[in-house]
């Protein structure tokens, strides 16, 4: 392995921030991988909830885009990207829509916490560029995503899932099926 040459563009970019960005890239790719697993679980012929599948596939693409945005930032700031192995999802069988939404909510809260810690690090290292980047591209979107998932969990519970397969089907058809026209 060759050592990376020093960057000409690096300025006020602490090594701790560079390392934290690489960890965040890994976490975003992990989240994308989890959502991809969820998507294709709901696409199975014995589950057949196509709008859950579409919803989680969209989430997977968003998380991958977040990772790519961080990679672009790393290069712009003169940092070096060091990719790590992406952990496989904790499960392959997501059981039902409520369980998957609860797992997704927990995942988004974890990603948000990591971003908040990255923002604190950037503040501590006096890096206004990184603070602005995180605020502009991530924090508000995370809060919206957490709220949306929380609403989905609440509605699925109120409808009586997972005991009621009909409720899950109706949520898939009417809530997730209508989200395309609202976006």
UniProtKB/Swiss-Prot annotation:
Record-level GO BP terms: intracellular iron ion homeostasis; iron ion transport; negative regulation of ferroptosis
Places the protein is found: Cytoplasm; Lysosome; Cytoplasmic vesicle, Autophagosome
GO terms under cellular component: autophagosome; cytoplasm; cytoplasmic vesicle; lysosome
Main location: cytoplasm
Gene3D superfamilies: 1.20.1260.10
Pfam families according to UniProt: Ferritin
Domain (Ferritin-like diiron) ranges: 11-160
The protein's name in its UniProt record: Ferritin heavy chain
Species per Swiss-Prot/TrEMBL record: Felis catus (Cat)
Source species taxonomy: Eukaryota, Metazoa, Chordata, Craniata, Vertebrata
């Amino acid at each position: 392995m060759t050592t990376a040459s020093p960057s000409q563009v690096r300025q006020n970019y602490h090594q701790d921030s560079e390392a934290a960005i690489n960890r965040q890239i890994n976490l975003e790719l992990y989240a994308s991988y989890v959502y991809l697993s969820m998507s294709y679980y709901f696409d199975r012929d014995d589950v057949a909830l196509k709008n859950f599948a579409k919803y989680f596939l969209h989430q997977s693409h968003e998380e991958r885009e977040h990772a790519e945005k961080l990679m672009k930032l790393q290069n712009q700031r003169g940092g070096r990207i060091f990719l790590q192995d992406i952990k496989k999802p904790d499960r392959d069988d997501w059981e039902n829509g409520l369980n998957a939404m609860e797992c997704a909510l927990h995942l988004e809260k974890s990603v948000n916490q990591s971003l908040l810690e990255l923002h604190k690090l950037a503040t501590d290292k006096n890096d206004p560029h990184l603070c602005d980047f995180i605020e502009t591209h991530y924090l508000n979107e995370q809060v919206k995503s957490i709220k949306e998932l929380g609403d989905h969990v609440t509605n699925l519970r109120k409808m009586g899932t997972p005991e009621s397969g009909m409720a899950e089907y109706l949520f898939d058809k009417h809530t997730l099926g209508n989200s395309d026209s609202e976006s």
